[in-house]
Regions:
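Domain-level signal for soluble alpha/beta catalytic cores
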Residues: 1-372
Length: 372
């Protein structure tokens, strides 16, 4: 088993553009023109090809590209008992576009009566490891699941099952423990919790999304930090748990904007992760000063290369920004990656596979120049 630990000096978030043959296989399956066995065969082939390409580029971490998912987060929730979903009529609002992902809601107590599908997904990638690579498993954070079922659009429905948030939180913590323990038994030692809640908290209208005031939002921050920390505390001690803080990433659009200043004390100071993958690809993310709040010896992966546009960043400008960030956190605790995945949902961002690989080549070139 590989003993490598994430993050690496040049790294990536996790999702990749779906190849055309996978999109076609998914379309045929959804339309009843093929069965699951045929779909899985194509998924397997595409994942093997993806991992081979990642290795060819010289990266030390591998994922399945999230090729078996419709979205980065909802598929994970669909794997639990007590969670239902139906095709949406309105979608989720992004800037300039709505993400037409399934409405997902509580239909009973959240539980896990059988192995979560993501565990078998991980086993497939684990088998593709070699001495130079390690598989990581991405999943939405516990806070993301809590937000999904407690934000105003779902609150009344959730209250039909749960009398208070503590009951819901306890059930979420319990199912995460089962999933993480099963992943550990399958050989997983690197997990990434993807989390859009902090991006919403940082947005100037974030409080309205939670039906509270700017001051009241601090209590929500603490609740989300607490549930993440409870899950982290339950994990095996040698399980590396990182987090990716996102502002939404659908078809090259975004859901929230705002600097990290308003969430830094709680997120950077009190969340007990090993490393933060942070978006810093444009002015929506603000400056680097909040990084001074990153406590202990936690690491920061700077997401300075955008996945929302095919245009390649200026290498020297990125290098300069890395050194700017090192004014607030030592260079030896900094790393580099794209700002997000390339396809948080099946539709993917507006660039080609070739442009996607060019982005990863650039990340590696810059990281090698900065850190050697």
């Amino acid at each position: 088993m590989s003993n490598l630990q994430t993050p690496f000096r040049y790294d990536f978030v996790g999702s990749f553009l779906r190849p055309d043959k996978l999109k076609e296989a998914r379309r045929m399956f959804d339309n009843g023109e093929s069965d699951y066995t045929a779909l899985k065969k194509v998924e397997d082939e595409c994942i093997v090809e993806l991992v081979a390409k990642i290795k060819e580029l010289g990266y030390n971490v591998i994922t399945d590209g999230e090729f078996r998912r419709a979205t980065w987060h909802l598929d994970f929730m669909w794997g639990f008992d007590g969670v239902g979903h139906t095709p949406t009529e309105t979608g989720l609002p992004f800037h300039g576009e709505a993400a037409m992902v399934d409405d997902t809601y509580i239909v009973g107590r959240i539980g896990l009566s059988k192995e979560h599908p993501f565990v078998e997904h991980f086993r497939f990638v684990k088998a593709l490891e070699d001495e130079n690579t390690v598989a990581k498993q991405t999943m939405p954070s516990p806070a993301q699941v809590l937000a999904q079922f407690t934000m105003p659009f779902n609150r009344l429905n959730t209250e039909k099952v749960y009398s208070d948030d503590k009951e819901l939180e306890d059930d979420i913590v319990a199912v995460y423990k089962k999933v993480i323990d099963d992943l550990y038994a399958a050989g997983c030692r690197n997990i990434q919790l993807d989390d859009c809640t902090w991006g919403m908290f940082a947005d100037k209208i974030g409080h309205t999304l939670y039906g509270t005031t700017r001051e009241g939002l601090i209590e929500f921050q603490k609740a989300h930090k607490d549930i993440n920390n409870r899950v982290i505390a339950n994990a095996p001690k040698d399980m590396i748990i990182n987090t990716h803080v996102c502002r939404g990433n659908f078809h090259s659009t975004y859901a929230s904007e705002g600097a990290y200043d308003s969430v830094a004390d709680v997120l950077f100071g009190e969340e007990n992760v090993n490393a933060y993958f942070l978006e810093f690809d444009d002015e929506r993310s603000g400056g680097f000063a909040p990084l001074a709040k990153v406590s202990g010896d936690k690491k920061v992966v700077l997401g300075l290369i955008t996945t929302k546009s095919p245009k390649l960043e200026d290498k020297q400008l990125v290098i300069d920004r890395i050194h700017d960030a090192s004014k607030y956190i030592p260079l030896d605790r900094l790393y580099l990656s794209p700002q997000c995945g390339f396809a948080s949902c099946e539709i993917g961002n507006k660039l080609t596979e070739e442009e996607q690989w060019a982005k990863l080549k650039l990340v590696k070139e810059i990281a090698t120049e900065v850190w050697g």
